[in-house]
């Protein structure tokens, strides 16, 4: 559920969006993974809300500022809440990398 929602939410970026790994040749792309899924709320011992914690990584050979801005807007519009973000640079591949952490609450 969360994988499809993440991919569908980021489609308007018009760059590849892939679960965990990307092996293509695009200069800019997005990967993501769910790093935690946990029950958030219970009623009568039944889970009623599930939290999905997702890291979205933007990778680019060039300035990714606009891609990151649009990705954050798209994810917020889909109901994701931003937790944190970090600027990284992959020295070995000379690729700019922005890590964005979000969570999404799913009603059961």
State each model region's role.
Residues 1-108:
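Long, contiguous binding/interaction regions
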